């Protein structure tokens, strides 16, 4: 079978398996020269059933320290994943953005945009995204991540494209499209190659985030965007495959960017060749620091436990694990989730996270990585 190599040959029904991009190796896409940004799904901690705003600010400053030390561009993702997005009212959503902007007036952020009030709808309505878009667009220097929703996701490719375009035409800020596999929610379907190509050509969509457990869609996206030179940045949402995005010189947009922040920032820098101007800590050999491979192992083994699947085969409780990690690092006062959050770990989570952190805590001082405890 001749594989598709041109966007002109794509049809709405074309599966990835019919394209050359589904068979492109990670090795052929390796990039040792680009220090892409790290987008961290910032935790809104709670204390005594109320938002811990001091802990929120303290955790952001800690991550800024990590980024500054290694010269990594960091963007904070608010109201998604570790922000307990599905439990925030519009009022608390707006307050998170206001407080962040007041404390960090020049810091870029991405904010998750979900459909509101669609629970009883029988068909997709783009205006359901407008309330949070309006709140977000009160702020400058931010991007909008258009989170997938059931009624958006179940549309056929052409109707789904039209829906994304309706949303894109409403926004005034740069937007990021968000895709999931059914391994995360049962109704989710990743973008077909035709749909990805269509979204990538809309001027408001500067990139997309894809999260998968079973099929390497981030690799497909990366191969297509590089081959076709699309003005669209694939962002990896794969907390189970963090090293891949670093190796490809592409952005990460992950909850693991919080708990493993100094480790990931260090890896970003170590992967670069000495000849790259942005490299902060050069090897003196002209090459990259091959010790990064052991760092990859250390932070992935750690995050595999943070993101371990529960009895429902869901990784959603990782946000509770993240709170335990930040608490053990002395950054927040309590490992407490949002009071309405149902995705919780067990009573032994503090011990489990202590065990999970042993290897990264061992390797961090050996590689001179600061900000990760003793």
Regions found by a protein language model. Name each.
Residues 62, 99, 166, 198, ...:
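Alpha-helical scaffold segments in soluble metabolic enzymes
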Residues 52-59, 92, 96, 125-128, ...:
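General structural feature for long, well-ordered alpha-helical segments within catalytic domains
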Residues 3-190, 342, 368-371:
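Active-site beta->alpha loop and helix N-cap motifs at the rims of alpha/beta catalytic domains
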Residues 37, 80-83, 112, 207, ...:
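Glycine-centered flexibility sites
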Residues 109-121, 145-159, 180-191, 211-222, ...:
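Hydrophobic transmembrane alpha-helix bundles
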Residues 168-315:
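Catalytic alpha/beta core domains of metabolic enzymes, predominantly
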Residues 3-29, 34, 39-45, 66, ...:
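C-terminal alpha-helical cap/extension of soluble enzyme domains
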